[in-house]
C-alpha cells in the first residue's frame, strides 16, 4: 500500500474554528495549547542551546502531525525571537506507490516557507532487501539519515531539526532496556558520527497528545506512512500503548519517567564507566554521592493507590 492523505481536511494550516456556540471555548483552548507548545519548544531550545544566531535550520518534513507541528511552532518562535535564524523545510520523497507528491510543496508554498524536495527511491531498496513481513523501519531510517545529512551539506544548513517528541524519547528508552539491554534514549541534541552535522529535537518536551491536538486544530494535510509507521504489532507501537495505559491508570507517571531522564544518579546505578565503584572507600568525610543506606526511599505514592481506612461504628 502507498501513502494516503486525509482529503476531508480543509486547506493547509487553516484554523479549525467555526461559528457555533462553542467558538469562544475552542479559541481559548487553542490559545492555551499554542502557548504550551511554544513554551515547551522554547525551553528545549534554550536548555540545550539548539538554535543560535545565524543558524540555518533544516526542518525535516515527513508529512506527519509531528513534523508539521515542529515547523509551525518554529515559525512562530522565529517571529518573536531576539536572534535571527533561517528555516528551510526538506522532504524526502521515497517513491512510495501512491505518495501524494503535491501535498507538501503546496502547503509549504502557501505558508511562504523555503523548501526542498529530495527524491530518492529508498522504497525500492527497502522492498528489495527486506523479506515480506519483516520490519522495514531500521533500514529505511538509515537510508533516510544518510540522504538528509547529504542534503543538509548541500543546502548549507547548520542544524537538522527532527520531529521526535517526549513520547518518542520514552519509547526509545524502554525499547533499548527491553530489547537492547542498555539505558539509551534519543538525545535532544547530538553531533553526527562524522562530526559534520548537529541534529536537534525541539519537540523533546512536548507530549504526543499535544502535537495531535495541534495538527487537528490547524488542519494540516497529513500524509500517512504505510511503509513503516502503519505496520501493526511493531515493538514501538506496543511500548507506546503500554505508556498510554500507564498514564491512564496513574496520571503523571509518564511525566515522572521523562523527568527521571534529567535526574540521573550514577552512584546508584551499576555502570562502572560512570562511577568509580572500585575506589569507593570510607574517608570519614561527607560525600554528595553518598547515601543513608538504611533510610527508606522517599517515593511519591500514586493517588489511585492511596487507601483511606475509615473506622465504622458497630451497630448496637
UniProtKB/Swiss-Prot annotation:
Motif PP-loop motif: positions: 62-67
Cofactor or coenzyme needed: Mg(2+); [4Fe-4S] cluster
InterPro entries membership: Rossmann-like_a/b/a_fold (IPR014729), TilS/TtcA_N (IPR011063), tRNA_Cyd_32_2_STrfase (IPR012089)
Keyword Transferase annotated: yes
The EC number(s) this enzyme carries: 2.8.1.-
SUPFAM superfamilies: Adenine nucleotide alpha hydrolases-like (SSF52402)
GO cellular component, as recorded: cytoplasm
Region described as Disordered: 1-31
Keyword list, A-Z: 4Fe-4S, ATP-binding, Cytoplasm, Iron, Iron-sulfur, Magnesium, Metal-binding, Nucleotide-binding, RNA-binding, Transferase, tRNA processing, tRNA-binding
Gene3D superfamilies tied to this protein: HUPs
Residues bound to [4Fe-4S] cluster: 137, 140, 228
Bound cofactor: record note: Binds 1 [4Fe-4S] cluster per subunit. The cluster is chelated by three Cys residues, the fourth Fe has a free coordination site that may bind a sulfur atom transferred from the persulfide of IscS.
First-listed, main subcellular location of the protein, grouped into a coarse class: cytoplasm
Pathway where this protein functions: tRNA modification
Pfam family name, one: ATP_bind_3
Family to which the UniProt record says this protein belongs: Belongs to the TtcA family.
Protein name stated in the entry: tRNA-cytidine(32) 2-sulfurtransferase
Organism: Verminephrobacter eiseniae (strain EF01-2)
Gene: ttcA
Amino acid at each position: 500500500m502507498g501513502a494516503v492523505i486525509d482529503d476531508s481536511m480543509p486547506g493547509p494550516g487553516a484554523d479549525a474554528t467555526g461559528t457555533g456556540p462553542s467558538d469562544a471555548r475552542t479559541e481559548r483552548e487553542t490559545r492555551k495549547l499554542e502557548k504550551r507548545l511554544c513554551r515547551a519548544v522554547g525551553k528545549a531550545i534554550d536548555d540545550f542551546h539548539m538554535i543560535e544566531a545565524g543558524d540555518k535550520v533544516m526542518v525535516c518534513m515527513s508529512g506527519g502531525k509531528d513534523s508539521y507541528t515542529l515547523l509551525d511552532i518554529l515559525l512562530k518562535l522565529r517571529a518573536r525571537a531576539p536572534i535571527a535564524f533561517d528555516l528551510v523545510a526538506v522532504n524526502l520523497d521515497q517513491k512510495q506507490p501512491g505518495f501524494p507528491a503535491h501535498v507538501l510543496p503546496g502547503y509549504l508554498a502557501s505558508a511562504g516557507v523555503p523548501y526542498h524536495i529530495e527524491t530518492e527511491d529508498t522504497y525500492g531498496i527497502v522492498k528489495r532487501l527486506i523479506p515480506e513481513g519483516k520490519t522495514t523501519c531500521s533500514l529505511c531510517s538509515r537510508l533516510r539519515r544518510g540522504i538528509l545529512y547529504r542534503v543538509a551539506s548541500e543546502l548549507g544548513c547548520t542544524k537538522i531539526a527532527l520531529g521526535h517528541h517526549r513520547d518518542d524519547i520514552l519509547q526509545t528508552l524502554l525499547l533499548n532496556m527491553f530489547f537492547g539491554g542498555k539505558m539509551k534514549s534519543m538525545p535532544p541534541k547530538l553531533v553526527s558520527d562524522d562530526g559534520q552535522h548537529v541534529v536537534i529535537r525541539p519537540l523533546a518536551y512536548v507530549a504526543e497528545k499535544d502535537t495531535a491536538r495541534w495538527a487537528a486544530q490547524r488542519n494540516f494535510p497529513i500524509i500517512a506512512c504505510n511503509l513503516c509507521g502503519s505496520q501493526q504489532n511493531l515493538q514501538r507501537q506496543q511500548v507506546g500503548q503500554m505508556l498510554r495505559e500507564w498514564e491512564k491508570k496513574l496520571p503523571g507517571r509518564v511525566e515522572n519517567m521523562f523527568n527521571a531522564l534529567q535526574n540521573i544518579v550514577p552512584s546508584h546505578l551499576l555502570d562502572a564507566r560512570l562511577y568509580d565503584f572500585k575506589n569507593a572507600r570510607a574517608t570519614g568525610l561527607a560525600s554528595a554521592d553518598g547515601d543513608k543506606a538504611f533510610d527508606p526511599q522517599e517515593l511519591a505514592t500514586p493517588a489511585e493507590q492511596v487507601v483511606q481506612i475509615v473506622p465504622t461504628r458497630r451497630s448496637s
